[in-house]
Each structure stands twice: as structure tokens, then as C-alpha cells.
């Protein structure tokens, strides 16, 4: 091939992973990132793989589909997983990272790689025949988004995403909260703000009547269920939050708790959890409280949470518009487009949802871009693995009803033989098979 390098556009999680996977296989990369030249309202730095929403990579157990996906990615030498592990912060049974330290480490490793040339510039058009991975994410610039929109057949696929507020730990009233992980799983990693029924009812009323920031679009509000604004959830019903982010089960009061409670109940009526957001432990995010309320309203309403009456918000919640492609009609399982095998897409724009899933798509796209570059046949990971099931789902589901998807055991190929009734045992069996099949696939 006359082309001497591969283009990667976008240095988020998917683009950073794709660039690394290409370079580690000996192919030069030109990595384009517009931040540094043109910023977005949601990004706070110019670093690569910045985590805009939560700092959590979610569950770490192999009986959790995202835990399996992460383990598969570790075995494929994922730059995102490796640096995530190096910058972990306590989060019970989940994997959370110091977002600044982690993204700085990814940025440094990319910059130091001898085969990766970083170009700070905005790309406004889709390259012609050059082998290219586009991983510009949900915050793609308007000009490039318009070109992708044309590729999409003019159809608008989108939903709205929101991020949760972050507070300064030193401004939390520690006497009103307690340290505990749900069901005491893992280390006690969350600060829990318990509410009585009276406190919850007042909070729910304030939340459902608070003023929201206006959307910069005439389009209908559509949300991805995994990142729904807390005020939207609250409006679905008085108890919706009690089965979601404010679920109290497994978060019993400690014996020495002296704050307000409903009679002699051992468990609060509702609980708001705070999760450590940086390695120093000075910042905590409000778990599941992504929001689109006006900033003044966020301060007023969220300071009703016990322990946060005088909390200082170092970042308020924000919302942004996520666009995604008609992947069932446009993409192959390799993340190459059906019409142009030299053009690959990766990340949330393909319809995978979540940090880990985005990085995984970049990993697969990067590997296949190299194979295309070398004139080799592209690879499709086994559908028995999480990293193979995800691209299979987004490219084979019904286009009319296509929406972004997190990895889950439901999209992984079913086990052969009699169904295992116990869910944990079934998931363990799926994970064991996945890792064996991945090993066979890599050694083939």
C-alpha cells in the first residue's frame, strides 16, 4: 500500500486506544485532536481520554459483563485499562479512577510513543481513500458531524447525556454521613448521606419543580437510560429514585450513627452516595445524580442532601448531545464501513455506550485498521466474548429500533447444553468460556 501511516481522528478513549493498538503493531499513526485549538463546553482539559461524565469504569467482577470486557481488554494490552489500573481510587466492587492522573498518564504515553504523531487540529471532512479511524465521540464538531450525518443518510440519531456534580470533601458535614459500600462489598468506599422519609419527600418536591437549563436544540429530549438526569428520573414517579441511585438496601446505619432517622429502622428511607473522584480523596461525585438543572438550582436543591448543606461544588452537572450512527446499516463487525473498507469508526458514535465499551471499540478498530493496512483479512472476535458480542450486536440489531447499548450478558452467545439456573454460576460459566475462546482466538 502507498499509504505510509494510518489516520486516527479524535483522542478520546476510543481514539487513544486505536492509536496505541496501531502503533504497537509497528504502523505510524497521525493522531488528530482538536482540543488545544478548539474546545468543547464539556471537556475541562486538553488531555487525551478525558472522562467527561463519571470517573467509574463500573463493576470489576467477572460475573459482571463489563468486568469480563475489561479482563479481555487487559489481555489485549489495552492502554486505557493499563493506565486505569495504575490510577485506581477506592470504589468498593467497582473500578474508579483518579480522572486527572489517569488522562494525564494516557496523554504522556501517547505523546512519547515514537510512531504516534499528535496533531492538534480540527478535521472538518471525512478523508477520502486513506485508512482512517474516526473516533471523535459524542461531542464531534459541527462541521465533521454534518459529514457523518450525510454518511448516515441524513437521519438524526441522538440522545442527551448528563454528568453529575462534584463536591469538595472538606465542605461535607462528616457527622451526618457514614462510610460504607453496599452490602459491605469490597472496602468501605462510599460516603452515604441518609434521608428520612420526610427529608426525601421534601427533596423530591424540590427536584421535580427545579428549573432546568434550556436545550440548545428544538429536538425532542431523548435520554440514554444509563445516564438519565436525576430530575427526569424523579418526574417518573415518587419512588423511582428509591429503586435507582437513592436505593437504601444494603446501606444500613452504622451502630454509632447519631443523625436523624425514622424511628428504630436500621436502614434509611433513602440514601445519596458520594464516590471518591481523585486519588487524593479531596473530591467526591454524587453517584447517579447527572443533571441538567441550572447551576443555581443545583446548589439549592442538592444542598438539601444531609451532609451537603454547606458543600462547595467544584463542578456542576452538565448535559450534552450525543450523536450516534446507523451502525446496523453502515458498519461491519470490524468497525469498518460497508461502503469504504478503509474507513473505520469507533467509540460512542457507533452506538456502544460507556467508557469501557468505547475503548473496546477503538481496540478492535485499531487492530483491523492495521490488518487492512497490511493487506490482511480483518478479524471478527468470537461472539462468545464480550469484545466480540458488542460489535456483533450494534451491526446486526434492527436498525429501526437501534439505540446505544452497554455490554451485557444478554448479547453474548448463549452457553450450549442445559441452561444453568443459578445466575451467578451461569455468568461465571460464560466468563470462563469467553476467556478460553479469546485465548484460542489470539493463539490461532
UniProtKB/Swiss-Prot annotation:
Keywords: Cytoplasm, FAD, Flavoprotein, Methyltransferase, NAD, NADP, Transferase, tRNA processing
Sequence positions that bind FAD: 10-15
EC number: 2.1.1.74
Catalytic activity: uridine(54) in tRNA + (6R)-5,10-methylene-5,6,7,8-tetrahydrofolate + NADH + H(+) = 5-methyluridine(54) in tRNA + (6S)-5,6,7,8-tetrahydrofolate + NAD(+); uridine(54) in tRNA + (6R)-5,10-methylene-5,6,7,8-tetrahydrofolate + NADPH + H(+) = 5-methyluridine(54) in tRNA + (6S)-5,6,7,8-tetrahydrofolate + NADP(+)
Compartments reported by the entry: Cytoplasm
One Pfam family here: GIDA
Entry cofactors: FAD
Domain of life of the native organism: Bacteria
Identification of the protein by name: Methylenetetrahydrofolate--tRNA-(uracil-5-)-methyltransferase TrmFO
Organism expressing this protein natively: Streptococcus agalactiae serotype V (strain ATCC BAA-611 / 2603 V/R)
Amino acid at each position: 500500500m502507498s499509504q505510509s501511516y494510518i489516520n486516527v481522528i479524535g483522542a478520546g478513549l476510543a481514539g487513544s486506544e486505536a492509536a496505541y493498538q496501531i502503533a504497537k503493531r509497528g504502523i505510524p499513526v497521525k493522531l488528530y485532536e482538536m482540543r488545544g485549538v478548539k474546545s468543547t463546553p464539556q471537556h475541562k482539559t486538553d488531555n487525551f481520554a478525558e472522562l467527561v461524565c463519571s470517573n467509574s469504569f463500573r463493576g470489576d467482577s467477572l460475573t459482571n459483563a463489563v468486568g469480563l470486557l475489561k479482563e479481555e481488554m487487559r489481555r489485549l494490552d489495552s492502554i486505557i485499562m493499563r493506565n486505569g489500573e495504575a490510577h485506581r481510587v477506592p470504589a468498593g466492587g467497582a473500578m474508579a479512577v483518579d480522572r486527572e492522573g489517569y488522562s494525564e498518564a494516557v496523554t504522556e504515553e501517547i505523546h512519547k510513543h515514537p510512531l504516534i504523531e499528535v496533531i492538534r487540529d480540527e478535521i472538518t471532512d471525512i478523508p477520502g481513500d486513506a485508512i482512517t479511524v474516526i473516533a471523535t465521540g459524542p461531542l464531534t464538531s459541527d462541521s465533521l458531524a454534518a459529514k457523518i450525518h450525510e454518511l448516515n443518510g441524513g437521519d438524526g440519531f441522538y440522545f442527551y447525556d448528563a454528568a453529575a456534580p462534584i463536591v469538595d470533601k472538606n465542605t461535607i458535614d462528616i457527622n451526618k454521613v457514614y462510610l460504607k459500600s453496599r452490602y459491605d462489598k469490597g472496602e468501605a468506599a462510599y460516603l452515604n448521606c441518609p434521608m428520612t422519609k420526610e427529608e426525601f419527600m421534601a427533596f423530591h418536591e424540590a427536584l421535580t419543580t427545579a428549573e432546568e437549563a434550556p436545550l440548545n436544540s428544538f429536538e425532542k429530549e431523548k435520554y440514554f437510560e444509563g445516564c438519565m438526569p436525576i430530575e427526569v428520573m424523579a418526574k417518573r414517579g415518587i419512588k423511582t429514585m428509591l429503586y435507582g441511585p437513592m436505593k437504601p438496601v444494603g446501606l444500613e446505619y452504622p451502630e454509632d450513627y447519631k443523625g436523624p432517622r425514622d424511628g428504630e429502622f436500621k436502614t434509611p428511607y433513602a440514601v445519596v452516595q458520594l464516590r471518591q473522584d481523585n486519588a487524593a480523596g479531596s473530591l467526591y461525585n454524587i453517584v447517579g445524580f447527572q443533571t441538567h438543572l441550572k447551576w443555581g438550582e443545583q446548589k439549592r436543591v442538592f444542598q438539601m442532601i444531609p451532609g451537603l448543606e454547606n458543600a462547595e461544588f467544584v463542578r456542576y452537572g452538565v448535559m450534552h448531545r450525543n450523536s450516534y450512527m446507523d451502525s446496523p446499516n453502515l458498519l461491519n463487525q470490524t468497525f469498518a464501513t460497508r461502503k469504504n473498507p478503509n474507513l473505520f469508526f469507533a467509540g460512542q458514535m457507533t452506538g456502544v455506550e460507556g467508557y469501557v465499551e468505547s475503548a473496546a471499540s477503538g481496540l478492535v478498530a485499531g487492530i483491523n485498521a492495521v490488518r487492512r493496512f497490511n493487506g490482511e483479512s480483518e478479524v471478527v472476535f468470537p461472539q462468545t466474548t464480550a469484545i466480540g458480542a458488542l460489535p456483533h450486536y450494534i451491526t446486526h440489531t434492527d436498525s429501526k429500533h437501534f439505540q446505544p447499548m452497554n455490554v451485557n450478558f444478554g448479547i453474548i452467545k448463549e452457553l450450549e447444553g442445559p441452561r444453568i439456573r443459578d445466575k451467578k454460576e451461569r455468568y461465571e460459566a460464560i466468563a470462563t468460556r469467553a476467556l478460553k475462546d479469546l485465548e484460542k482466538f489470539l493463539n490461532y
